[in-house]
Amino acid sequence: MRKAAQPVVMLMAALLTACTADSGRDELVVFGAASLTDALIDLESTFEADNPDADVKLNLAGSSSLREQVLGGARVDVVITANLAVMDELVDSGEVRPDQVSIVATNGLAIAVALGNPGNIRGIEDFERSEPFLGVCSPAVPCGSLAYEQFESAGIAASIDTEEPDVRALLTKVIEGELDAGIVYESDIVIADGAVDGILIDAPEVRYPAAPTVRSQNPELAEQFMAFLNSSDAQEILTDVGFRQR
């Protein structure tokens, strides 16, 4: 049984200090959206088991943070974002080739509700009420921009108490009872493993594009990892942690 999700921490400083020569393996740096945390940890283990010479290093954060790191020149071999807009920016900047982008996962929006439903949340319309403690992601990241798009399309003047930097930080606050509810992804409800209740939101499907970077220091291994992400084994791992069938 999976443990409840913990806050996402920026992993690069700790993970990238070890060089390839020290491990004797080929290092592959993968940047992934925060909502992919549990999936990527499982995918990393499976890929390394199938490729013993590979040493996958994960950097997990909000998509906007990943974008800034890539544009800032950080080392990265494969990047996976939680929406097409961020990937399009990386394509436009020349960091990623458009013909190498593929959709590796899909998801949906959901409301994570604190156990016992202290805020009496029944749907997205309750985000207009002032008395519950409600949260969303920052509009700078996909889960936040999508939430605000839903408010706008439903004509809701949302009363929001906090905007979190990524979806895992938001989910953690709901799990710990700091918030009555927050708008997350369907997969986050699954990962929470009973620590929250979930209400699905009728919203457009969320698509996760992935691509190797032009500056990859290990392009052959990056291509292998991309092929793995599109394999049936990887897709099974993704559905096991709450992502939709692609």
Which residues does each PLM region occupy?
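Sec-dependent bacterial lipoprotein signal peptides
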Residues: M1-T17
